[in-house]
């Protein structure tokens, strides 16, 4: 599974681990992604992988639960 947000396209960035002695080694900063059931603009409900920032901002709409 690619670590990419389906809504905003956020993906991993590269950076450094920096030790106390100021030694540097490469690392990856990965986005905080979650799989949620979301209602698409067409009205279809689908499972999508989105970052938590998109969830909190309301960019992704969760479907209304159907109760029997």
UniProtKB/Swiss-Prot annotation:
Q: What processes does the entry annotate via GO biological process terms?
A: translation
Q: What domain of life does the native source organism fall in?
A: Bacteria
- Protein's recorded name: Large ribosomal subunit protein bL28
Q: What GO terms fall under cellular component here?
A: ribonucleoprotein complex; ribosome
- Cite the GO molecular-function annotations of the record: structural constituent of ribosome
Q: Which ranges are annotated Polar residues under compositional bias?
A: 13-22
Membership in a protein family: Belongs to the bacterial ribosomal protein bL28 family.
Key words of the record = Ribonucleoprotein, Ribosomal protein
Stretch list, region Disordered: 1-30
Q: Which InterPro entries match?
A: Bacterial_rp_bL28, Ribosomal_bL28, Ribosomal_bL28/bL31-like_sf, Ribosomal_bL28_bact-type, Ribosomal_bL28_sf
User: Whose protein is this, by species?
Assistant: Solidesulfovibrio magneticus (strain ATCC 700980 / DSM 13731 / RS-1)
């Amino acid at each position: 599974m690619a670590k990419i947000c389906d809504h905003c396209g956020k993906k991993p960035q590269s950076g450094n681990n920096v030790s106390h002695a100021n030694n540097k080694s490469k690392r990856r900063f990965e986005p905080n992604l979650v799989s949620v059931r979301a209602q698409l603009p067409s009205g279809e409900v689908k499972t999508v992988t989105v970052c938590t920032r998109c969830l909190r901002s309301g960019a992704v709409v969760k479907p209304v639960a159907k109760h029997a």
